């Protein structure tokens, strides 16, 4: 029998065990990580050779949650796991982002990482174990990989950082931050926060990086005893002669092209130069270099041109200095029939953002492995190919769109009103209509404006900005509001969103090692300046939320009844509530605690439904006079309905002062009568009287 090799370490309040050698032995690397009964299996397989003509690194990362891990059977007809959930997609990206930069340049072999959740403790999210497991599996596989990485979640409560807080602890934490990196460098940060200062955010990153060393050390110890021999892979030898020839043919033109400030014109010019250079080096040439080889060198020329200019203090591609935000144009209320809308344009990046208000029935039901729950706030980000002037696949939501949408959602959620204060379900959709960098942050700005245009009482406006970095040795430049090319050719993508009072979301992806605390400090401070500049323009366009929601949005009324009366409102088989909704044109939602939300396109309908519910749930008062309707005649009296669902007995002796021989001589079915309640008993039976009113009137 195979023997498992294990390494155990303490990580915050958790005990973590790394295990390899028993399961999935045919994979290139396989590690099981157990964190307090949350168990994940990470496997890595790499092709021994790159495909001919391959010109990019084909890394795929898939994180998969199995329902059996939480002792559940999937819903749906087929009773098996289906397409990836949003949580699975986001966690796959979380694993991918810090490991991708650690594969060597020129390594184009296909690599597949699969992480499977096998057991779930509901208090321990599987994402941090998954990142550690993927890092460990890569490290023991022998595949060229400049790791390992560690990963940590950091919370913040009562002025203290929390290492790997539980799900319960996160409910009271003002911060939920995930940081990943190597022993010497931070590579990735993903977070949401409740208006924390830049200093607290930076401190959390540094704290997480310090604490993750325990995970990195444990992985290194596992590699020492269980690691496979390192691959004898060497990067392709540089073709210095070809590099010199490409420079000779293209460098001067590339430098000139990067003085064109319009993105489309610049892109077209660079494409012309690239095609011309390839043709000059390949047409009719024996043993000509491959197009991919020439393209790689051409990209190096582009990067070198942009980077050297910025580090030398020259203007950026579009003529700005390092701290200037592109021109901003804002319009709100741009779509006539939507509940809230905004068109936010920053340079050549534009987002049309729409907010829609719905009822509780519109909440998104999430069937997660830990259990079903509902989301009252959704943000969807769409990035069609026309936004960059290209053709491409359309209609299928891509991983990037899901990731950008979640980042924008994180930025805005802290400023939303609580459900008890604003009971609407909220959906925000960001349609990216133009893109030249920072479209997710444009979605944050446009989303904040659209929500306020819809009348959502946001606590404050939220703005977002994307920062970049160019670093060469000890020289570096932090760039405010980066363009697409600056993101592509730079060393860091650093997105910060927040209010005037603090940060609500932070995302960082670093492509190189050696980013110091000081550099991150400069980037955060510069991002703060840019954010405040954008917030001022947003507040000039729409300072506070509209006083009321759109005329096209449903009207909501909230009320509370005695929980024992819920069945009276619902009625047998739902008959009462169905009839009530049809008559008043409303949607009525009832919670187990007696909370009721009434929604309607008209305020009148909602008020009418509320009054009817108050009648249904009203307590019958002894001595009170009611306007009732005779519903049935009996030999010994009549049944009179005095409130919805509440009937009482009008005994023959209580109809008139004289003797009544035939009840039908005095009252008819359907007749409206005034009656007084004489008594109610413990079983809810009600005795009524008409005679008592006759005597009172006579008196």
UniProtKB/Swiss-Prot annotation:
S1 motif domain span: 623-691
Subcellular location: Cytoplasm
GO biological process: mRNA catabolic process; RNA processing
Cofactor dependency: Mg(2+)
Entry's EC annotation: 2.7.7.8
Enzymatic class: transferase
Matching InterPro entries: ExoRNase_PH_dom1 (IPR001247), ExoRNase_PH_dom2 (IPR015847), ExoRNase_PH_dom2_sf (IPR036345), KH_dom (IPR004087), KH_dom_type_1 (IPR004088), KH_dom_type_1_sf (IPR036612), NA-bd_OB-fold (IPR012340), PNPase (IPR012162)
PROSITE patterns tied to this protein: KH_TYPE_1, S1
Residues annotated to bind Mg(2+): 487, 493
Main location: cytoplasm
Catalytic reaction(s) noted: RNA(n+1) + phosphate = RNA(n) + a ribonucleoside 5'-diphosphate
SUPFAM superfamilies: Eukaryotic type KH-domain (KH-domain type I), Nucleic acid-binding proteins, Ribonuclease PH domain 2-like, Ribosomal protein S5 domain 2-like
Domain KH: residue ranges: 554-613
Keywords assigned by UniProt, alphabetized: Cytoplasm, Magnesium, Metal-binding, Nucleotidyltransferase, RNA-binding, Transferase
GO molecular-function term, one example from the UniProt record: 3'-5'-RNA exonuclease activity
Recorded family membership: Belongs to the polyribonucleotide nucleotidyltransferase family.
Protein's name according to its UniProt entry: Polyribonucleotide nucleotidyltransferase
Organism field: Azoarcus sp. (strain BH72)
Gene: pnp
């Amino acid at each position: 029998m195979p023997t498992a090799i294990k390494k155990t370490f303490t990580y915050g309040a958790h005990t973590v065990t790394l295990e390899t050698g028993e399961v999935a032995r045919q994979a290139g690397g396989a590690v099981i990580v157990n964190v307090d009964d949350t168990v994940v299996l990470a496997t890595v397989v790499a092709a021994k050779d790159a495909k001919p003509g391959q010109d990019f690194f084909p890394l795929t990362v898939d994180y998969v949650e199995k329902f059996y891990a939480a002792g559940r059977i999937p819903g749906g007809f087929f009773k098996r796991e289906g397409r990836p959930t949003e949580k699975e997609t986001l966690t796959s990206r979380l694993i991918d982002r810090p490991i991708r930069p650690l594969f060597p340049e020129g390594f184009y072999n296909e690599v597949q990482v699969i992480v499977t959740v096998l057991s779930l403790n509901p208090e321990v999210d599987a994402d941090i174990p998954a990142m550690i497991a993927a890092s460990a599996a890569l490290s023991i596989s022998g595949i060229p990989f400049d790791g390992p990485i560690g990963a940590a979640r950091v919370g913040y409560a009562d002025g203290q950082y929390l290492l790997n807080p539980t799900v319960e602890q996160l409910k009271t934490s003002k911060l939920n931050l995930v940081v990943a990196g190597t022993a010497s460098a931070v590579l990735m940060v993903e977070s949401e926060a409740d208006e924390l200062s830049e200093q607290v955010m930076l401190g959390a990153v540094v704290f997480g990086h310090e604490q993750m060393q325990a995970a990195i050390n444990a992985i290194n110890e596992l590699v020492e005893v269980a690691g496979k021999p390192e691959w004898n892979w060497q990067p392709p030898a540089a073709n210095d002669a070809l590099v010199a020839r490409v420079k000779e043919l293209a460098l001067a033109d590339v430098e000139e092209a990067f003085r064109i400030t319009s993105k489309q014109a610049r892109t077209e010019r660079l494409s012309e130069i690239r095609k011309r250079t390839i043709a000059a080096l390949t047409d009719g040439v024996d043993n000509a270099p491959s197009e991919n080889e020439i393209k790689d060198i051409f990209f190096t020329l582009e990067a070198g041109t942009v980077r050297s200019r910025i580090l030398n203090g020259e203007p950026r591609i579009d003529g700005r200095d390092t701290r200037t935000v592109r021109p901003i144009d804002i319009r709100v209320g741009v779509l006539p029939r939507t509940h809230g809308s905004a068109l936010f344009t920053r340079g050549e990046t534009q987002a049309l953002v729409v907010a829609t208000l719905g009822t509780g029935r519109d909440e998104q039901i999430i069937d997660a492995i830990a259990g079903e729950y509902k989301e009252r706030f959704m943000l969807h980000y769409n990035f069609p190919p026309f936004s960059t002037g290209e053709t491409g696949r359309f209609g299928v939501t891509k991983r990037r769109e899901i990731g950008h949408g979640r980042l924008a959602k994180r930025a805005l959620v802290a400023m939303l009103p609580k459900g008890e204060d604003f009971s609407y379900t909220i959906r925000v959709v960001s349609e990216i209509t133009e893109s030249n960098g920072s479209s997710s942050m444009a979605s944050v700005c446009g989303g904040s404006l659209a929500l306020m245009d819809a009348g959502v009482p946001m606590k404050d406006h939220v703005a977002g900005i994307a920062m970049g970095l160019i670093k060469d040795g000890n020289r570096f430049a932090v760039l405010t509001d980066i363009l697409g090319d600056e993101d592509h050719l730079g060393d860091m993508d650093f997105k910060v969103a927040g209010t005037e009072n603090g940060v609500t979301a932070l995302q960082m992806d670093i492509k190189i090692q050696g980013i110091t605390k000081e550099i991150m400090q400069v980037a955060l401070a510069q991002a703060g300046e840019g954010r405040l500049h954008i917030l001022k323009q947003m507040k000039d366009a729409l300072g506070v939320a509209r006083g009321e929601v759109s005329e096209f949005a449903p009207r909501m009324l909230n009320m509370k009844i005695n929980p024992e009366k819920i069945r009276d409102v619902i009625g047998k088989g739902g008959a009462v509530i169905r009839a009530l909704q049809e008559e008043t044109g409303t949607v009525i939602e009832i919670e187990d605690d007696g909370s009721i939300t009434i929604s309607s396109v008209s305020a009148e309908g909602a008020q009418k439904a509320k009054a009817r519910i108050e009648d249904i749930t009203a307590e019958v008062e002894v001595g009170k006079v009611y306007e009732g309707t005779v519903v049935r005649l009996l030999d010994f009296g009549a049944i009179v309905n005095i409130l919805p669902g509440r009937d009482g007995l009008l005994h023959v002796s209580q109809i008139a002062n004289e003797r009544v021989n035939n009840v039908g001589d005095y009252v008819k079915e359907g007749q409206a009568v005034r009656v007084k309640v004489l008594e109610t008993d413990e079983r809810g039976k009600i005795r009524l009287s008409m005679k008592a009113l006759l005597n009172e009137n006579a008196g």
